[in-house]
Each structure stands twice: as C-alpha cells, then as structure tokens.
Amino acid sequence: ACDILKIKDKQLREYLAMPNRVLRVKIPVKMDNGKIRMFTGFRSQHNNDRGPYKGGIRYFDPEGGVKYMEREVMALSSWMTWKCAIVDIPLGGGKGAIFVNPKKEKLSDGELERLTRGFAYKIAEVIGPQKDIPAPDVYTTGKEMTQIMDTWSKMNGNRYSPGVIT
C-alpha cells in the first residue's frame, strides 16, 4: 500500500507496517457435555490515527493453525486501515478472530453464545464506541454482534451502547 501511495518516508513506512496492538486471548468455554474447552482468539488493531479501529470478527480455522490465523488477522486489520482511508471514512483498521469453525465442529447455539460472550469479555477493555468497533465477518452475524454489545454493556455500567458494534 505504501508503494501505491508513494509513501517514501522510511519511518512512516515502518510505522504503518505493523499493528499498534495484537491482543491474543484464551477463552474457556463450558461445552454442552460439561467439559471445559479452550479457544484462542485475537483482536488486531492496526492504526487509529484517523479514528477508532473498525473491523470484523470471524470464526476461522485456517489449515496453518493459530500462528497463521494471527498473521492473517494482522494483515486484514491493515487492509481495513487502508480501505477506510481510501474512501475517507474517519476510522482505523481492526480485525478479530476466534480459532473455530462452528459449522465443521457443529457447536450448539449455547456453545457459540458462551464462546462469543467469553471473547467479548476478554477483549472488552480494548473495544468500545470510541476505541474499536467490531462488525460481523466470516461465520458471524448480527446475533453475535448483539451478544458482544450486551456483554460489553454489562461490563460498562449496564449502559446501552449500540455504538460498540456495527
């Protein structure tokens, strides 16, 4: 992207090359069979110079495993920065993922909700209307975004905050 935009300044290129923050979390989820299963999730926040981070949360199980997923999430958060900048939307780039394929693994609705709320709890300190605004992505919908909003709101004084998600 720096080449296309003809950004020559070496320090600026280095600054834009990596996310500001990548949060890696472990999410314990009580499964329907009573056992606890650990999931790994990420939230990459690439750049917020133009406004709050913005980007999807996906359920994702790449063949390369968790390490590949982390790099993918970092790259996708970068793309969100550039997409918002190109169309002059005052938002930065973010992206999140949980290492799971709910279709292949046939997780129940309850298991998915506990997973989503657990992830929201773990990333709550870095998201919010003025910080980072998650959105649906692969295998997530408005249903999961509502669960994230509800969890975040309960952790922030029970204030109704629809602006925490899109």
Where are these regions (language model features)?
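Glycine-rich, N-terminal phosphate-binding loop and its surrounding beta-alpha-beta segment
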Residues: R21-K104
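Glycine/serine-rich phosphate-binding loop and adjoining beta1-alpha1 elements at the start
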Residues: F60, W82-T166
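Alpha-helix initiation and N-capping motif
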Residues: D9, E70, T141-M145
